[in-house]
């Protein structure tokens, strides 16, 4: 297998996993927000339920967040009286517990057949053998990322049924749902770990991870509007506005006023294209941010990609394959030269 074919499969794996995760996550977030809580806030409640008396640093580790991010979420949850903290001998360290109201919020956000929950759309998409294959590959990846602690969390939330009310499902479907939840959590850990690993190497280019993702989308779809960028990226319009403003100020993109009111057509500049190719050569072509994928066989990666593509299609991520092909066409043309 030629190097660019192998790297295409790595590129595909990452983006197929990323877009499947983002589609499920965005749907989950919208569903949860109807109860006046955000998904990250609910996730902290799950973690505390699984590990009563847990510390802030351990919540950050399990949730794949920074400590300042968790600190802000904790403040909000305490103000809502959904959690409380126990003082310890070391007054600088606190242990967090759920209040009765916190437990209630977990219960009302358990998903069932009456809610449009995308994880349910995946029931019947894969056989048990295919589900096990996906789980085994991502388990191997997570172990190499040294995130084994996530397995205990996944096991506990499956035992507690904090995410889904399984009352009206038969035994076979319960097994499939639990495996699907497992995959969702493994995808999340993998994607957020790669994002974290990529953040530091990007500092030399003076861009954030989100700005890099936006540049790739703009490169793949020349003339894209901000609203279209929002849809493909799963970012809010306000987030896209900030990202576009920053990229434009750094001369990495061009903006041209569109016929639609308050809209602009976006194109990547030569400086922006040079940046994404330099980042690819330095951090992705070398597998610097994909170290955990090195020992997975090429055939397993191909097989996994087929399953992840099926997942994206079921979730309605029809642009994913086009995005992968267009971005890798740019990579092949600029980074390989054959």
What residue spans do the PLM features occupy?
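C-terminal regulatory/oligomerization modules of transcriptional regulators
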Residues: 1-5, 128-181, 299-338
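N-terminal leader segment of winged-helix/HTH proteins
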Residues: 1-35, 152-205
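A structural signal for well-ordered alpha-helices, especially hydrophobic packing surfaces
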Residues: 21, 106, 142-146, 191, ...
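N-terminal helix-turn-helix DNA-binding core of bacterial DNA-binding proteins
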Residues: 26-69, 197-236
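Residues within the helices of the helix-turn-helix
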Residues: 57, 75, 94, 227, ...
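Residues within the DNA-recognition helix of helix-turn-helix
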Residues: 73-76, 239, 243-246, 307
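Charged, amphipathic alpha-helical coiled-coil/dimerization segments
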Residues: 78-132, 246-302
